[in-house]
C-alpha cells in the first residue's frame, strides 16, 4: 500500500531541495512547492565505531600499487565496446501490433537480393552467396570472362558465375573482412536508412514511433551524464582520458583519495570510520542523485506528467531502483564497477571482502549485470527500456491504471521494433529483455531485505531520508 502523505518526495518531481529540519519532522503534510537546491551537507553524518588507519610512505605505496595493479589492470579491458551512439537513421518502425513485412524489415543480401542470413565477409549476404564467395576464394576459382554485365538476383544468381563473383567484389565482399565479425554500426545504419523512406510511406505510424524513440534518447542523454557508450569506452580503454584508478584493497582506497574526487565518501585521513559503512553511505548519496536523474527523465516521457499525481509518485517509487540497477550494469564488467563518474574502478573482490552484510549488497548486481550486458543493448535501446519499466501498470496502489497501460503499450511497440532493427541477428531479444524486468524486481526485493537486516544490526546508522520514503512499504 502506498502512503498518501510523502514528506520527502516532491509532487512536482524536482527532488532537488533537501532540508534536514524538514526531514526530521514527520508531522507536516506533503509540500507541493518545487524544491530548488540540493544541500546534502545539511544531513549530518551518523557516528560509527572508529577504526584507525595509517598512511604508508607515498613512494613505497605507489610502488606496491603499481605491482598489484598489473594483476587488476586487465579487468578494465575485458569486454567488447558497446555499440556507438544512437543514430536517428537506425530507428525504423513498422505499424503497431503488426509483424514487420519480410520485404521491408529483413535486410537483403547485397549480392542477389535474397534474405540475408547475417554479416559475411564484410557485407550482409545470404547463405548461397556466402558459400559461393567462400568456395571461389578458398579454391582460387577462375571463371570464364563475361562482358554482358549480367543482372544478379535470387533466380538468376547461378547462371553466370563470373558476373556473380564480380557483384560480390563490387558490393564490398572481402576474405579479409571475416575477421571483423559482426556488422559495423555505420554499415548497419546505412542499410537501415535505405529502407527508411519506404517504411514511412507504407506505415505513417512508424514515423511517430521513430520520433518517440528519438525524443526518449535525447531526454536520456540529457538526464544521465555517464551513458553506457561512455562507460564502455572507459572499460575497454577506448577513451583519450586517463584510465580509471583501480581500487582493490584498503591501501589502494587510501591512495585513491589523492587521485579521485570523491563526492560522497569522506577521506580516510579525515574520518577513520569503518570503510564498509562509509562506502555504503556513499552509495546512498549516489542513489539519491540517480533518483533525481530518473525523475527528470520520467517527466519527459510523453504522457507521464498527465497522469494522476499520486500515480506518478507510485510509479517512481517502485521503478527507480529497478532503473538504477539497469543503469549500474552499464558501469560494470565481471571484475568490477566504475565509480566517481568513471574516475575510479572498484573491484568486485574488494566489495565482496567488506564485512557482512555490506559485502553481500553488490554481488547480486554483478550477477545481473554480466547477464544483462550479454544482451548488448545500447543507449538507444536502454532509453526505451527504462521508460517501459517506469510505466508499469501493475504497481501496487495505482489509482488509474488504464492510461498507464496505454502509454506502456506504445513504448513496448517501440521497444520491440527497435530491438528487431538494431539487433536483427537476435530474434528472441525482445522476450529476453522483458524477462530482465522480472529479474530486476527480484533484485530490488532482495536489496530491501538486506536493508532490513542492516536496520536491525547497525542501530546507529540511518538511511537517507529520501531513500527511507522510497523503501517504505516497498515489497
Curated annotation (Swiss-Prot):
Example GO BP = regulation of transcription by RNA polymerase II
Residue ranges of the annotated DNA-binding region, renumbered to this chain: 106-180
GO cellular component labels: cytoplasm; nucleus
What domain of life is recorded for the organism?
Eukaryota
Q: Where is this motif: 9aaTAD?
A: 465-473
Q: Where are glycans found on this sequence?
A: 54
Q: Post-translational modification, briefly?
A: O-GlcNAcylation at Thr-54 reduces transcriptional activity in adipocytes. Phosphorylated at basal conditions and dephosphorylated when treated with the ligand. May be dephosphorylated by PPP5C. The phosphorylated form may be inactive and dephosphorylation induces adipogenic activity.
Query: What keywords appear on the UniProt entry?
Result: Activator, Biological rhythms, Cytoplasm, DNA-binding, Glycoprotein, Isopeptide bond, Metal-binding, Nucleus, Phosphoprotein, Receptor, Transcription, Transcription regulation, Ubl conjugation, Zinc, Zinc-finger
What coarse category fits the chief subcellular location reported for this protein? nucleus
Q: Which residues carry this modification: Phosphoserine?
A: 82
- One GO MF term attached to the UniProt entry: transcription cis-regulatory region binding
Q: Where are the zinc fingers (NR C4-type)?
A: 109-129, 146-168
Subcellular localization is given as: Nucleus; Cytoplasm
Q: Which PANTHER family match?
A: NUCLEAR HORMONE RECEPTOR, PEROXISOME PROLIFERATOR-ACTIVATED RECEPTOR GAMMA
Family the entry assigns: Belongs to the nuclear hormone receptor family. NR1 subfamily.
Description of how the protein assembles with itself and partners: Interacts with FOXO1 (acetylated form). Heterodimer with other nuclear receptors, such as RXRA. The heterodimer with the retinoic acid receptor RXRA is called adipocyte-specific transcription factor ARF6. Interacts with NCOA6 coactivator, leading to a strong increase in transcription of target genes. Interacts with coactivator PPARBP, leading to a mild increase in transcription of target genes. Interacts with NOCA7 in a ligand-inducible manner. Interacts with NCOA1 and NCOA2 LXXLL motifs. Interacts with ASXL1, ASXL2, DNTTIP2, FAM120B, MAP2K1/MEK1, NR0B2, PDPK1, PRDM16, PRMT2 and TGFB1I1.
What's the entry's take on its domains?
The 9aaTAD motif is a transactivation domain present in a large number of yeast and animal transcription factors.
- The identity of this protein, by name, is Peroxisome proliferator-activated receptor gamma
- What is the organism of origin for this protein? Cricetulus griseus (Chinese hamster)
Name the gene behind this protein. PPARG
Amino acid at each position: 500500500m502506498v502512503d498518501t502523505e510523502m514528506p520527502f518526495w516532491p509532487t512536482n518531481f524536482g527532488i532537488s531541495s533537501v532540508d534536514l529540519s524538514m526531514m526530521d519532522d514527520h508531522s507536516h503534510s506533503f509540500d507541493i512547492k518545487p524544491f530548488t537546491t540540493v544541500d546534502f551537507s545539511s544531513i549530518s553524518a551518523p557516528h560509527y565505531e572508529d577504526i584507525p588507519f595509517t598512511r604508508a610512505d607515498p613512494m613505497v605505496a605507489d610502488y606496491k600499487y603499481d605491482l598489484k595493479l598489473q594483476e587488476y589492470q586487465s579487468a578494465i579491458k575485458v569486454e567488447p565496446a558497446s555499440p556507438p551512439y544512437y543514430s536517428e537513421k537506425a530507428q525504423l518502425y513498422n505499424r503497431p501490433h503488426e509483424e514487420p513485412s519480410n520485404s521491408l524489415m529483413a535486410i537483403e543480401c547485397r549480392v542477389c537480393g535474397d534474405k540475408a542470413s547475417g554479416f559475411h565477409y564484410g557485407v550482409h549476404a545470404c547463405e548461397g552467396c556466402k558459400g559461393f564467395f567462400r568456395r571461389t576464394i578458398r579454391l582460387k576459382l577462375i571463371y570464364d570472362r563475361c562482358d554482358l554485365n549480367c543482372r544478379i538476383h535470387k533466380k538468376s544468381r547461378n547462371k553466370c558465375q563470373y558476373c556473380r563473383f564480380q557483384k560480390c567484389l563490387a558490393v564490398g565482399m572481402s576474405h579479409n573482412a571475416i575477421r571483423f565479425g559482426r556488422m559495423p554500426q555505420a554499415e548497419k545504419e546505412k542499410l537501415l536508412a535505405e529502407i527508411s523512406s519506404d517504411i514511412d510511406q507504407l506505415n505513417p505510424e512508424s514515423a511517430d514511433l521513430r520520433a518517440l524513440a528519438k525524443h526518449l534518447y535525447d531526454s536520456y542523454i540529457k538526464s544521465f551524464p555517464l551513458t553506457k557508450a561512455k562507460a564502455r569506452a572507459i572499460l575497454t580503454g577506448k577513451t583519450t582520458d586517463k584510465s580509471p584508478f583501480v581500487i582493490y584493497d584498503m591501501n589502494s582506497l587510501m591512495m585513491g583519495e589523492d587521485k579521485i574526487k570523491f563526492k560522497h565518501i569522506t577521506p580516510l585521513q579525515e574520518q577513520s570510520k569503518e570503510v564498509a559503512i562509509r562506502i555504503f553511505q556513499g552509495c546512498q548519496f549516489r542513489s539519491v542523485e540517480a533518483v533525481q536523474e530518473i525523475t527528470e527523465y520520467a517527466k519527459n516521457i510523453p504522457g507521464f506528467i498527465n497522469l494522476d499525481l499520486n500515480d506518478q509518485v507510485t510509479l517512481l517509487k517502485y521503478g527507480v531502483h529497478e532503473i538504477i540497477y539497469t543503469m549500474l550494469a552499464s558501469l560494470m564488467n565481471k571484475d568490477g564497477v566504475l565509480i566517481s563518474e568513471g574516475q575510479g574502478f572498484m573491484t568486485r573482490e574488494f566489495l565482496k571482502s567488506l564485512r557482512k552484510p555490506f559485502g553481500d549488497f553488490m554481488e547480486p548486481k554483478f550477477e545481473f549485470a554480466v547477464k544483462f550486458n550479454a544482451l548488448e543493448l545500447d543507449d538507444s535501446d536502454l532509453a526505451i527500456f527504462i521508460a517501459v519499466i517506469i510505466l508499469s501498470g501493475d504497481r501496487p496502489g495505482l489509482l488509474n491504471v488504464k492510461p498507464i497501460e496505454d502509454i506502456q503499450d506504445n513504448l513496448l511497440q517501440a521497444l520491440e521494433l527497435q530491438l528487431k532493427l538494431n539487433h536483427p541477428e537476435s530474434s528472441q531479444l525482445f522476450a529476453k529483455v522483458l524477462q530482465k524486468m522480472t529479474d530486476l524486481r527480484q533484485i530490488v526485493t532482495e536489496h530491501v531485505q538486506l536493508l532490513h537486516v542492516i536496520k536491525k544490526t547497525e542501530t546507529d546508522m540511518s538511511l537517507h531520508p529520501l531513500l527511507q520514503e522510497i523503501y517504505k512499504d516497498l515489497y
